Curated annotation (Swiss-Prot):
GO terms for cellular component: nuclear envelope; nuclear inner membrane. Residues 1-28 form the signal peptide. It is found in: Nucleus inner membrane. The gene is NEMP2. This is Nuclear envelope integral membrane protein 2. It is a multi-pass membrane protein. The lineage of its organism: Eukaryota, Metazoa, Chordata, Craniata, Vertebrata. Residues 410-438 are annotated as: Disordered. It comes from the Eukaryota. It comes from Gallus gallus. Belongs to the NEMP family. Keywords: Membrane, Nucleus, Signal, Transmembrane, Transmembrane helix. It holds the Pfam family NEMP. The chain crosses the membrane at residues 144-164, 173-193, 202-222, 235-255, 275-295.
Length: 447
């Protein structure tokens, strides 16, 4: 078996390196460093330093992208972050200082393969590779345009903040949160379970702060060595998850869900703060994360993303969906107007076609009964003669025989309907008279 990555770093050199890095007293070894660029691969035999210069221009297409540096070799090498390029001395917040200290202290001293994810739009990142022997090692940098982890964290943060009030009142989510807290932060879970046995509140808050710091450190250690632990000690990891998860569920079930409004409110605020952490960790550009976190607490800001998504979805649906043809019946007036318009348009098209030089006029004239009338139509005369117009008015106009026949038929049908209804009413009355019982007023006297 070849050399593998050592899971734990030796505390002596790492602690010394941490102290020097925090003090900023270690100068850069050597002269210029090799610059890392996206998509490039560098192969070296001897000790060398490498730097990644951050791009100061922000691009929104990189909001969920990550830059990953991979260092691999057939033999072990030492990975040393360049102290003056580290962020510890110039940390702006306590969280950045603690993260930098943990990163320098926890980084394994020797390994055969190392993966680094560089935070973009921050400080320039430099490190040094020290091989124990002259063996070829490779340093490559790649960019993943859409990191699924970042997108999942961002979506989870938005969902958790938006439904924090509803989730804090859910019994199932309470048990699920207890299991997750017990697995990831066992010390915090145990302290919360034993809260009733701690008399002073100040002591409880001091212990809670220490447990949270220890839990965050253990979470970071597990994250950095998760691949190695899963490949080498999978059974122990699964056993820990099952045992601690079951114990956490039993403790939450014994305690019962939250009932007081104060506890539910505190749980809601905790979920919202966790959502802010997810949003910040799920966005690669800090300025964008700050803007989203600033907009989310406002009541009006809660309605903007759903409204914008609904508006964009409606526009896309109208754009891609084929328009349905609406069919309706024409009124009598619309039918007459449309008929006159289409007739005039068709006659003009016929005149234009007959005036075309390609039209075989002699062949058409030979088949017509009145060529003189056809020539007049082509030159602009009406297609109907005055005699034909008069005959049409007499046949279908006001006072025509056709209209009289229509009116007579309508009147006859209405009279027949009235007669039929009268006959039915008479029959009903006769039936009522037949079925009506006959009374004998003198029946008593006859008896």
């Amino acid at each position: 078996m070849g050399p593998r990555r050592l899971p734990w770093a030796r505390p002596g050199p790492a602690l010394g390196l941490l102290l020097l890095a925090l003090a900023g007293a270690v100068p850069a070894a050597g002269g210029s460093c090799s610059l890392l660029e996206e998509g490039n691969t560098i192969q070296k035999l001897h000790e060398d330093c490498f730097c990644y210069v951050q791009n100061r221009t922000m691009h929104l297409q990189y909001i969920w992208s990550t830059v990953q540096v991979k260092i691999n070799s057939t033999r072990t090498f030492r990975f040393v972050p360049t102290p003056e390029k580290s962020n510890c001395r110039n940390s702006e917040t306590v969280f950045e200082f603690a993260a930098c200290a943990v990163q320098i202290l926890w980084r394994p001293e020797t390994s055969t393969e190392t993966f680094l994810k560089i935070k973009q739009y921050g400080e320039d990142f430099c490190f040094r590779i020290q091989p124990f022997k002259e063996e070829l090692y490779t340093v490559s940098m790649t960019r993943e345009m859409l990191d699924g982890k970042l997108l999942f964290l961002f979506a989870a943060g938005i969902f958790l903040f938006h439904f924090a009030n509803s989730l804090s009142r859910s019994t199932n989510f309470f048990y699920l949160s207890g299991i997750i807290l017990g697995v990831l932060a066992l010390l915090v879970f145990v302290l919360l379970a034993l809260k009733r046995f701690i008399p002073r509140r100040s002591t409880f808050w001091i212990l809670l702060s220490g447990c949270w710091m220890s839990s965050l450190y253990l979470i970071y250690c597990f994250k950095e060595n998760m691949q190695w632990l899963w490949s080498e000690h999978r059974i122990y990891v699964l056993g820990y998850f099952v045992a601690v998860g079951t114990l956490s569920f039993a403790t939450c079930y014994q305690h019962g869900p939250l009932t007081s409004e104060l506890s539910i409110t505190l749980f809601t605020w905790t979920l919202q703060l966790t959502a802010f952490v997810f949003i910040y960790c799920g966005v690669n550009i800090p300025q964008v994360a700050y803007a989203i976190i600033a907009v989310k607490p406002s009541p009006k800001g809660l309605g903007y993303p759903p409204a914008a998504a609904w508006h964009i979805g409606r526009k896309m649906k109208n754009h891609f969906q084929s328009k349905k043809v609406v069919v309706r019946c024409l009124t009598e007036e619309e039918y007459r107007e449309q008929g006159e318009t289409e007739t005039v348009r068709a006659l003009e098209e016929l005149r234009s076609f007959c005036k075309n030089p390609d039209f075989s006029s002699w062949l058409a004239v030979s088949k017509l009964q009145s060529p003189h009338r056809f020539a007049g139509f082509v030159l602009g005369s009406p297609h109907v003669s005055p005699a034909e117009t008069k005959a049409h008015d007499e046949e279908y106009g006001i006072g025509s025989s056709f209209l009289e026949e229509q009116l007579f038929e309508t009147r006859t049908e209405s009279e027949q309907d009235e007669t039929t209804s009268y006959i039915h009413e008479g029959d009903d009355e006769n039936e009522d008279e037949i079925h009506e019982p006959i009374s004998f007023p003198y029946a008593t006297e006859l008896l």
